[in-house]
Amino acid sequence: MSWLTGSVQGASTTFQLGCSVLIAVSLVTAKPVKGQGVALERAPQFLPTTATNVKQSHRLPTLLQATIDPAHQSTLAPAHQLTIAQSIPPNVAPQQLPREPSPPSTQPPPASIPAPLPPLDQLLPLPGSQPIVPFENTLETITVDRFEVVGSTVFSAAEFAKITEPFTKRPLAIVELFQLRSAITQLYLDKGYITSGAYVPPQTLQRGVVTIRVIEGKLETITVTGTRRLSPNYVRSRLAIATRAPLNRDQLLKALQLLQLDPLLQSLSAELSAGTRPGESVLSVQVTEASSLSTQLIFDNARAPSVGTNRRQIQISQGNTTGLGDRLSASYTNTSGSNAIDLSYVLPLNPRNGTLSFSYGSASSSIIEPPFDVLKIESKARYYELAFRQPIVQTPTHELALGLTATHRQSEATLLDGLIPFPALGADPDGKTRLAALRFFQEATWRSSREVIALRSQFTVGLNALSATINPDPPDSRFFSWRGQAQWVRLLAPDTLLLLRGDLQLADRPMLPLEQFGLGGQDSVRGYRQDALLADNGLFASAEVRFPILRLPKLDGLLQLTPFIDLGTAWNLGNALDPDPRTLVAVGLGLRLQYSDRLTARLDWGIPLTDINGAKNTLQENGLYFSIVIRPF
């Protein structure tokens, strides 16, 4: 449901060149992520009148392509004012270190384009009414004072009384008795219980009471065929939770729809047939697996100029590593001044799509932007994360999930090829920062054929654990923050989309650079350099419309014009000064090219409406952003 395509910002520390040189001279010695007998009629098999055989190859359209930078950046901001700073050219703004590794807990997944769900009427068609079985002595009548319906776990006696009352206290032909039985069966059918129904067992009329027995249908077994690497139990277990007795058509339909939306499956066919015992059925499912191996090649200018804006990235993901539906992903990112690697493993825990995931990332960077390159500023960072996510509500159109993430992040920066520790905000005397935190998150998604709404909330508690940085005064690893993110994608016309995004962070105290909120860059306020503003709290909003201007049906290609407006504001807590300016506003225009699901290319031009000091040596700093995403397979 993109989740929020806005880049989740890291943090940083800043200082001016004069201070850096003075420290370099005076501190050269410093240390561097849960009883039947013969009856009036035989106990029937309540099944659809025709076998159900559905074959689907419907696939959801590709996700909105949002380049979420998992890379690693930190920023330098003024901290000291010394006379030697006069040697810096006046048009050069405080420059940036690479942002620290950005773990998955700060990167919500992109939402998909609104798309129709697999049609229900092609899955399990509603059966016709049960036929009345011919029998002898149709002119015989009886008088019934009361009917007793037994064997039902679905309907109450009061609900059955509404159906049986017109057949009591009067002479009743035997044929009417069977009409009543059929009416009770129809009640089940109308509520989706297509393999349940009623029959009249053998009995002697006593005290004017006739017993009608209900057989509530259930599955005898689920057979799965067509799997290659994927375990059949992956499919079977997800259908089993929706097919508990009594078997309900609507619940089975929803389970089949959810299964068809699973990226591990390309197509699905299902057939319901009679089992070996009365009231039992066999569900046969034929699946075709989708390719579980995917790769992405990304080239853009989404990194900070201090380490080189041009980013090269390769991502490889295996969605079914061991046959359990477990996903293993790896990515490598490179710029002229940085290298980063990110690994993740996601293991399904239960048929309700609960998952346990582990993520690791590591990055090393060097400042290559003049005039700061002479200081030989280097940084290293890594994160570890362990996360549990469990959908609480899951339907083809809505999902509500809760999760908990334990994260550990650490960074280290030095000057002069590692000779002097970098005096980062909140760092220890060795220039190191360590953070341990628990994140409790909530995610909600609503989708229809015309819109997708995605919401994400996350509460983070910083901990004094795992050698975390603890200082006499903040910032350190002890903090509390809340982050809320939202996205609404609306289909206005064919291939015409409205995309609204929002992002808000509120903290209770000054934050370590690792947890600060950033504004500026390709996935934030376009028109400014990456992370032009960094602060403890922040708000970001964006509106974008995508208009088709060229369609290439033979090539499955689409070119869209994308006008947009971005704005954001950031502010600090405690004694730290607010950024100046604290608000960024920009408008702009872009082109977006989509070629099948193999290529997505984008070019944006952001026009800043708020002036900000700084050099304009790169395309990014002049408001131009490009992105090319290639998916070979």
Model regions and ranges:
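Transmembrane beta-strand segments that form the barrel wall of outer-membrane beta-barrel proteins
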Residues: 270, 293-303, 314-318, 324-336, ...
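Repeated loop/turn-to-beta-strand initiation elements of outer-membrane beta-barrel proteins
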Residues: 293-295, 322-328, 351-356, 365-366, ...
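C-terminal transmembrane beta-barrel domains of outer membrane proteins
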Residues: 470-633
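Periplasmic polypeptide-binding modules associated with outer-membrane biogenesis and secretion
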Residues: 4, 40-44, 55, 64, ...
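Extracellular loop and loop/strand-boundary signature of outer-membrane beta-barrel proteins
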Residues: 301-302, 329-330, 370-375, 417-430, ...
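Transmembrane beta-strand segments of outer-membrane beta-barrel domains in Gram-negative
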Residues: 355-511
